[in-house]
Design a protein with these regions (language model features):
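Preference for protein termini
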Residues: 1-174
Length: 174
């Protein structure tokens, strides 16, 4: 049953130590990663379209950051007030006019999406600092393959295990 699989997943995550710290909690509380026992499968035709949009989004984020640290067209045009940029804790004045490799500022982007309806998705947030969810995604996939092997045998589900290799290749390229 689903309830048994939920218990099995929790036991394995606890035994292996797949937890996260609750920030701001002085007690240092460790919790199990949030794991949805019901697999969410995005059909290939939807993923293809979504992937294009997410790729474009990250490219646009890099263009935005480049503009902030160089010409500042978005500020000069009044689209975003200067104080909103320059008083932001993440703004780094020492990066002003610094050329970065391939104009890529965000080498890793954790884009959290939710499905709003058939073929409709929304972005909850873009995490460009430390998208720790990547490691959880890899562990989630391992757990899903363990709990639902027939699902992976019957369907052509895109692999994710090669992500660390892709990340390493990208980091070596800069």
């Amino acid at each position: 049953t689903v309830a048994r699989k939920r218990v099995e997943a929790d036991l394995i995550f606890r035994r292996v130590g797949i937890t996260f710290a609750v920030y701001g909690n002085n007690a240092g509380t460790e919790r199990l990663i949030p794991f949805d026992i019901i697999p969410r499968i995005i059909p290939a035709h939807e993923w293809s379209q979504l992937q294009k949009g997410l790729t474009q989004r990250v490219q646009d984020i890099n263009l935005f950051i480049h503009d902030i640290y160089h010409a500042q067209h978005i500020v000069k045009a009044g689209v975003i007030p200067a104080e909103q940029i320059f008083r932001n804790a993440q703004y780094r004045p020492e990066m002003q006019d610094v050329a970065v490799a391939s104009d890529i500022y965000a080498h890793i982007a954790g884009v959290d999406i939710v499905r709003a309806g058939a073929g409709e998705f929304y972005v909850l947030e873009d995490n460009l600092r430390v998208p720790s969810g990547v490691s959880y995604m890899l562990e989630d996939r391992k757990m899903m393959m363990r709990l639902f092997p027939d699902l992976f045998a019957r369907h052509r589900i895109a692999p994710v295990a090669h992500y660390p290799d892709l990340l390493l290749d990208m980091l070596r390229s800069v």
